[in-house]
Amino acid sequence: MWRQSTILAALLVALLCAGSAESKGNRPPRITKQPAPGELLFKVAQQNKESDNPFIIECEADGQPEPEYSWIKNGKKFDWQAYDNRMLRQPGRGTLVITIPKDEDRGHYQCFASNEFGTATSNSVYVRKAELNAFKDEAAKTLEAVEGEPFMLKCAAPDGFPSPTVNWMIQESIDGSIKSINNSRMTLDPEGNLWFSNVTREDASSDFYYACSATSVFRSEYKIGNKVLLDVKQMGVSASQNKHPPVRQYVSRRQSLALRGKRMELFCIYGGTPLPQTVWSKDGQRIQWSDRITQGHYGKSLVIRQTNFDDAGTYTCDVSNGVGNAQSFSIILNVNSVPYFTKEPEIATAAEDEEVVFECRAAGVPEPKISWIHNGKPIEQSTPNPRRTVTDNTIRIINLVKGDTGNYGCNATNSLGYVYKDVYLNVQAEPPTISEAPAAVSTVDGRNVTIKCRVNGSPKPLVKWLRASNWLTGGRYNVQANGDLEIQDVTFSDAGKYTCYAQNKFGEIQADGSLVVKEHTRITQEPQNYEVAAGQSATFRCNEAHDDTLEIEIDWWKDGQSIDFEAQPRFVKTNDNSLTIAKTMELDSGEYTCVARTRLDEATARANLIVQDVPNAPKLTGITCQADKAEIHWEQQGDNRSPILHYTIQFNTSFTPASWDAAYEKVPNTDSSFVVQMSPWANYTFRVIAFNKIGASPPSAHSDSCTTQPDVPFKNPDNVVGQGTEPNNLVISWTPMPEIEHNAPNFHYYVSWKRDIPAAAWENNNIFDWRQNNIVIADQPTFVKYLIKVVAINDRGESNVAAEEVVGYSGEDRPLDAPTNFTMRQITSSTSGYMAWTPVSEESVRGHFKGYKIQTWTENEGEEGLREIHVKGDTHNALVTQFKPDSKNYARILAYNGRFNGPPSAVIDFDTPEGVPSPVQGLDAYPLGSSAFMLHWKKPLYPNGKLTGYKIYYEEVKESYVGERREYDPHITDPRVTRMKMAGLKPNSKYRISITATTKMGEGSEHYIEKTTLKDAVNVAPATPSFSWEQLPSDNGLAKFRINWLPSTEGHPGTHFFTMHRIKGETQWIRENEEKNSDYQEVGGLDPETAYEFRVVSVDGHFNTESATQEIDTNTVEGPIMVANETVANAGWFIGMMLALAFIIILFIIICIIRRNRGGKYDVHDRELANGRRDYPEEGGFHEYSQPLDNKSAGRQSVSSANKPGVESDTDSMAEYGDGDTGQFTEDGSFIGQYVPGKLQPPVSPQPLNNSAAAHQAAPTAGGSGAAGSAAAAGASGGASSAGGAAASNGGAAAGAVATYV
């Protein structure tokens, strides 16, 4: 028993499963393809003239089981199989194919698709035959119109369906060719009539017809008829007098109707002369034109595309042409509509015992009526259902059962048409199933992402999403109707596991998915808009940032299309993903997009490129030739993205066929015609060139030729001049007139001249070579006045303007006299003085008296360096300002004319006082720490006296102003000093530092620089310094040294320093005071014959850094000994030099006596003549053996100067000062160079002073080797120490130098 029960239960379960399997997917039919509501046209082939044109009536549906199809025609069942083979149905579809259309196929068709669950209904379509009849066969008519008046051509168009499109055209009477009419005076109304706003003589049709055409777009055919010949009756008055006020020709109905969504055109056609202008307004407001509302027929109609209810209103056209009263006409436009859904019914799937509502709402004008269809029949005819409630807009069914499954249709109808939709109700019982489970989804932050979860079931399952035991509802989470989860504005915290949960009353199911969130891609450097001239390169840069785990690809697009870099080699994507376009052209203009793309997202940035090129060549449209002018007409052909600025009209003539000249430049860019004057007796052609900011366009094609008639010349030669080239001639010159100015054949010049004295007769000469530009008249007196004129003559006569008489002169000769009594009246400054002279007579000048030239030079410059000052000829004194200060100046004066200088006066000389110096030659400032500079400069190029020192000023430079100017103290009173430390400045501040050199006359011009101090090195100690040392003369038996601070060349140098020393072996250091104003320190009071240890310490703020220790022995001679200043008279070097000189002279005398006693002769002067004169330098050589000079006192003047230190010495200022090492303190900046960034030099070890080395080495070259050898011998025996040797050498060199000036 139990076994039988088990088997029965198993069978029941199997049957239930089978039933469920069978029901799964069953549904009523649904129409998927159907005819559009309205009409469907077909074409019937005419007898043997054309082939058949099959057409189809579509009907397709889906459903389970597959639906079966049936048709009704004109409300009755339609058996398409009864039509032989002319009709067939597509397999598996309901679509009818009519292969051979016939007239009886016309009618209303409707398709039904049925299965066991319901019947779906398609739209009803009216199938109608398209046809076009022919025009009546009539001969061409001749009609007469009056010039200037409105006129109409009426078209009797043939019948057809749909109504044919009517047009008027022009048909040539000879070959029958057809041209369309596109004319602002001719307008076609909707009824096919052609309206002339006014008739002109050109409208007369002597060799053509006006013809009316009717076109059927569906049939692709047109027909022509109503041919008209138009005769225009001329009024015999000018066009400016033939005027007519506006007159109404055709207007739309005052009450016009438009359909929503359709095109509507309102007409307002008026005639009149001149052509009337039309202004449209709506409800009193002028219409703003747009893409949807435009003007048609040159403003005579208003076109509305896709009309809507807001377009209803009163439209008014106001018409005027300046003649008579303005006219107006108003049209009231109403907008109706075929029905359209505002709420469509939707397919419903539900379970038993549930409730379903179908809702259908529609609008339209007139208001539509809604009716319901059930399984292909009006719902009133369907089986009654007490659970079903039907109203105008809804169907409600409660307590659903399986038998409620079926199709429901909503039909909204008014007098203009209908709208229909068929849906179904499917009653099922299925537990939830997941057809597409959630997957592992990746996205980037900031975007929206959707995790799919597609479920099936009946009733429709409720889908919810779960994450970490929390239901996801609201906020950024949105569960869509199909079950998918949308997360908006994803963040990194959204990454993780997500669960999709589906449930209905028959069961539940769930599935898991996951979300990975990565960093979004972004553009960090966007390309910038670029404007470039054609031919240049353009570069767009694009940088991005993206998630490191994703691969990135950079692409470039132009105008929405990817750039093919292989096909376009001018486009290059570089390694940094920039886009470079080489040799740009106008067509490269457009929008360029940088696309940074990963597999998850992309970022874009756009920039526009405008490539501007020269304009296209203008197009000449015509030329009008008149007697003496031509009017050129042209059209511009594009500005290539840079507006046209102006035009240039060029011409050439038969005289210069290979060249083009400008007839007029800068023709305004708004002009398209221009009138150009022409010369007589020439053939002209013209062309036009357009200009924009890029340049000139190619020229237009040249115009036809314009020819002008001969005439007299319109001018005489220009630039007539009479001026002699020799003292005894007169040259008359002029500018030749080009052939374009000849104006007729046999052109020549008629040259006339005469003396400008009473009763003088004109002399004449004809010049027949038009290229000749002068005539020479010989044998004339020197510099006399003439009257001259040159006349242009041709076959037609003399020029029509009188020739101007020009004054000329024969040739000039050299002035005879020099100014006398040339004196310096008063010296007013170091560079200026008043000079006076006795003038020369004008007769002695023998030419145009231009004035005087004062020539001045100095003793050092010589006459080769003279300067000239020009003075007017009507004065006899002048203030001259070009003298050299503190110098012997020379001057002379002469008169001059247009060609020659006269003889000069006697030369005078005078001494000028000292002046102020020129600026120093250079100034540099090198930072020392954060609050000091080391300044270095070079002496002025022109001291203009004896330098007395320098003054230094400084001022702080702010962003918008300069601070107070201050003099740095102490100022420098020794002219030999060319460097100084400037301390006490602010860190990281900009200063303007100025320096002036001084003489006893005051300060010279300043030289300034601007430099910034270093930033304050907070918590940074100076780098390790070093130092050098020099031994100074002892003080009361105690040793003394000078310690030179050498700051670090590698790091922070420090701002100042101090010195430390101790006796070697002791532990206590003795510290000197901090030295803040100099870079050296003198340390005295040291025990003799003692070894000391020295250090220097660099200081900056609270930080000190010590140098390495150096040992110095107070009895050493390794360091240079610096000698205090002493006078020449008691200087040891001077005494030694005098002794050495005396020894050399005695030795030389002995040698000469010995040679003479031997009979030998040593004529130095003759030997020098044989070898040629040599130019020896002033500082070397034995000039007493040279050829005697005229100025015998020159050498003696230098003897006294040898006792004074020279200002412009070859040694540097510190060496002259006597307290520095020439090896380390030269003016070329070898010491200061240590502070130049990047060019810092290592410390230089002390070297002995050797100021006489150059002179000592030069002595053999300047004089005899014997003298030099003696000097060397004296130096060698002067002492055992190197210091003594140096002194002896100094003496020898000094002796040689003195010998130069003896």
Curated annotation (Swiss-Prot):
Ranges per topology, Extracellular: 24-1138
Membrane protein topology class: Single-pass type I membrane protein
Ig-like C2-type domain segment(s): 29-133, 134-225, 245-330, 339-426, 432-524, 521-610
Pfam families named among the record's database cross-references: Bravo_FIGEY (PF13882), fn3 (PF00041), I-set (PF07679), ig (PF00047), Ig_3 (PF13927)
Gene Ontology BP annotations: axon ensheathment; axon extension; axonogenesis; cell adhesion involved in heart morphogenesis; cell-cell adhesion; central complex development; dendrite morphogenesis; establishment of glial blood-brain barrier
Biased composition (Low complexity): 1253-1275
InterPro entries: FN3_dom, FN3_sf, Ig-like_dom, Ig-like_dom_sf, Ig-like_fold, Ig_I-set, Ig_sub, Ig_sub2
Transmembrane segments: 1139-1154
Compositional bias per record (Polar residues), positions renumbered to this chain: 1188-1203
GO CC entries: axon; dendrite; filopodium; lateral plasma membrane; membrane; neuron projection; neuronal cell body; plasma membrane
Location of the protein in the cell: Cell membrane; Cell junction, Septate junction
Region (Disordered): 1172-1223, 1236-1291
Glycosylation sites: N182, N198, N411, N448, N652, N683, N821, N1125
Leader peptide range in chain numbering: 1-23
Keywords associated with the record: Cell adhesion, Cell junction, Cell membrane, Developmental protein, Disulfide bond, Glycoprotein, Immunoglobulin domain, Membrane, Repeat, Signal, Transmembrane, Transmembrane helix
Residue ranges the record marks as coiled coil: none
Residue ranges, compositional bias (Basic and acidic residues): 1172-1182
Highest taxon of source: Eukaryota
Membrane-side (Cytoplasmic) residue stretches: 1155-1302
Domain Fibronectin type-III: 614-711, 716-813, 818-915, 916-1017, 1021-1119
Entry GO MF terms: calcium ion binding; cell adhesion molecule binding
Complexes and interactors: Forms a complex with Nrx-IV/Nrx and Cont. Forms a complex composed of septate junction proteins Nrx-IV/Nrx, Tsf2/MTf, Cont and Nrg during late embryogenesis.
Function: Essential for septate junctions. Septate junctions, which are the equivalent of vertebrate tight junctions, are characterized by regular arrays of transverse structures that span the intermembrane space and form a physical barrier to diffusion. Required for formation of the hemolymph-brain barrier (the insect blood-brain barrier). Vital for embryonic development. Involved in the targeting for degradation or recycling of certain septate junction components, including kune and bou/boudin, by regulating their endocytosis.
Name listed for the protein in its UniProt record: Neuroglian
Native species: Drosophila melanogaster (Fruit fly)
Gene that this polypeptide is encoded by: Nrg
